[in-house]
Amino acid sequence: IERLPVDKRKLVAKNKYDSVHDELLEVGTRLLSSERLTEISLNTISDYTNVSKTTIYEHFSSSFNAFLSEVIIHVGKKIQNIYTENLSQDPSSNTLLIFRTWYEFNFTNIMLMRNIYASYILLVDTEYFPITPVLIDIEKQLKDLEFSMKNMKEIVRIFYVSVDDILGNPDVKKIDHVMKDIEPVSYTHLTLP
């Protein structure tokens, strides 16, 4: 089989595009970590990077919702990178590890998580509503345990209720209190699929 020559200019352009896109997602993460969501727009991104407004608009199809969705997924991948190396063959332990990692990240990044949570409210019922890698991984672990759809929904509900508690009460700083609430319920569900 004969290979067609690769146009190196296209490869360089693709790498440059990906590099700029990653930079914009990092800037978005920093903005969501330090500013209120209502103070952020595609225009404000240009204040924190050397990327032109035109390029920013091109990367996100002139849509602030697309920007928020991609930043949320980007943050989800960061959280996923934290726990991935510690996953085992035990889906029960993995589920609790993912929850714990998520909560610890929430506790240490309150402003970011508040803005992400507010973004979810903005994006609900739109094409931009993001499904994070964290939720995909939790769902996979629960499927490996042969959970019913009803039990999977209950675990995810508990997950979101706990996120509400964290975001609603920034004085709650002890992850162990949250995990004490979720572990018994999780184990009950995990042992009774």
Segments the model singles out, each with a brief description of its role:
Residues 92-118, 125-130:
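Helical hydrophobic small-molecule/effector-binding pocket
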Residues 80, 84, 121-168:
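Amphipathic alpha-helical packing segments from all-alpha helical-bundle domains
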Residues 23, 31-66, 70:
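Helix-turn-helix
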Residues 71-98:
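Amphipathic alpha-helical linker/stalk segments
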Residues 18-30, 76-77, 82:
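A short, Lys/Arg-enriched amphipathic alpha-helix from helix-turn-helix/homeodomain DNA-binding modules
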Residues 1-19:
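N-terminal intrinsically disordered/low-complexity leader segments
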Residues 188-193:
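Conserved small/polar residues in nucleotide/adenosyl-binding loops
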Residues 86-87, 113-120, 166-173:
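Secondary-structure edge/capping motif, primarily at the C-terminal ends of alpha-helices
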